[in-house]
From Swiss-Prot:
Domain ABC transporter intervals: 27-249
Quaternary structure, from the entry: The complex is composed of two ATP-binding proteins (TagH) and two transmembrane proteins (TagG).
Region Disordered, residue ranges: 356-403, 439-466
Annotated protein name in UniProt: Teichoic acids export ATP-binding protein TagH
Compartment list: Cell membrane
Ranges of Polar residues composition bias in the record: 449-466
Record's compositionally biased regions (Basic residues): 373-384
Keywords: ATP-binding, Cell membrane, Membrane, Nucleotide-binding, Translocase, Transport
Function: Part of the ABC transporter complex TagGH involved in teichoic acids export. Responsible for energy coupling to the transport system.
Protein topology in the membrane: Peripheral membrane protein
SUPFAM superfamilies attached to this UniProt entry: LysM domain, P-loop containing nucleoside triphosphate hydrolases
Binding sites annotated in the UniProt record for ATP: G63, L64, N65, G66, A67, G68, K69, S70
Spans annotated as Unknown: 250-466
Amino acid sequence: MNTNKVKIKAEYLTKKFELLPAKSSKNKAKSLIGSNSKNEKDFWALRNISFEIRDGECVGVIGLNGAGKSTLSNIISGQIAQTTGRVEINGDVSIIAASAGMQNNLSGRENIRLKALMVGLTNKEIKSKMDDIIEFSELGPFIDQPVKTYSSGMKAKLGFSIMVHQNPDIMIIDEGLSVGDKTFVDKSQKKMFEFRDEGKTILLVSHDMRTIKEWCDRVIWLNYGEVKAYGRPEEVIPEYEKFVQWFKKLPKKEQEKFKTDQRQAQLDYSVEELKAEIVSQNPSKSRRVQREVTEELKNKKDNHKLSLMSKVIVWLCLLAFIWITLVSLSNATLAESLRHPKTFFTERLFKSDTRNMTSTTKKEAVVKTSSSPKKKVSQAKKTTKVSSTQKNTSSSSSTSNQNTYIVQAGDSLSIIAENHGYSVEEIQQVNPGVDFSVIHPGQEINLPEPTTSANSTTEQSDGANQ
C-alpha cells in the first residue's frame, strides 16, 4: 500500500457545459441573462470521475479526442471549475500545453520573464535562472525572436523549459512534448525522473503510448467523460490499444454512429444518474454524498451566467438608455420626464424642442443686431453713391432732354458753368430776367443748347466728379 501523501484527489467529479443551438451574438446574450434556457442543452464533458495521485507519482491520462482529458487537466490546474464533486490539491500546480500561455508578439526571452513574474518569481530569481532556461530550451539565437515565428516544437521546448525551472510541486503536461524532437523528449524524460525522485507529482496527458509507458506509474483511461480504467500501464494500455484497433476497423458509418451514441449519452446524463452511480459504487456513503451533490448543485453558479443582482443592473441600464433616447426625441428635459411621465408620453414625446429653437433664434438675432451698424454704414455709403449717380443722371437727363439744371447745395453759377462746359455769360444769356447774384438749392435754370464738344467736356467732368 502506498503511504505517500496524497497530492491530487478527485471525488465524484463532473463538468457540465451548456450547448447553444447556434453560435451567434443573439444566443450568447440570451444565455448570459438566462432567457435562453429552453434552447440550451446540457453536455456532460466529465461524468463521475474519482481518483488519487500521490507524492512522486507520474500518472498518464489517455483517451480518444473529445474524451475529456484537457477538461480534467484544466480543472486540476484551477483554470475552470467543476460542476459537482471535490478536487483536493496539495501543492503548487504548473501546467504546460503546446503554446499555452505564450504571448505571440513577445520574444522567447520576454515570455520567460512574463511567465516567471506570473508565478511570483522576483527579478533577481529570474535573472539567475534565465541562462539555464534558455540553454535547456535549445532555442539558441531564436530566443530573441517573436514567439509567433516559432514552430509548435519550439513553443513546446520553451514552455517545458520555463515550467521545470519554476520548481512546482505538481506538474501537468497536456500534449506539451508530443511535438518535440526525440533528443529533447529524452532530455525532458530524464528531468521528469529527477522530479519524480524528489517526490514531485506529474500528470501527463498524451496520445503517445511510448512516452506513457516509459514515464508513468499509473494510467487513467478516459472514454467520453468517464473513467474506463485506472491502473498500471501494463494493465491499462493494452486494453486501450485493443479498443483503438477495434474502433479503427469499424466502417466509417459505424465509427460515426459510435461517436454519436457516446455523445448522446453525454447529453442524456443527469444528476439523478450520478446519484445512482454513487449508490452502486459506495452504499455506505451514498446518503451523505447525495446530499453533498444536491447542495453543490443548489449553490453552484454557472460562471458564464449573470447573477440575479447582475441581471437587475443590466435591465436597469438598458431601461435608462431607452429613456434617455426618448427624452432626446422630445421637447422635455430628463427631470421633466421623470416628474411627469404620463404627460411626457402623451404630450411631449416626439415633439420638436421649441425652447432650443427660441434660444437659437435669439442668438441669431443678437448676431444680426451686432452686425447691423456695419450694414447701416455700408448701406449709407451705397445710398450716397446712388444719390450721386442719380444726381448726375438727373443732370445729364435734364441737359439732354430739357436743357435745364436743378441747383444743388453748394452750387454757384461759376461752378455750374465749369462743370457743364459753358461760360457764365452763356448761361446768363439763356436765362434772361434771372438774378444770378443769389441762387438757392432747388432752383431751376436753363442751360445753353449742347454741342458735341460741350457734351464731351461734360462727360469728362462727370467722370472726374464720380
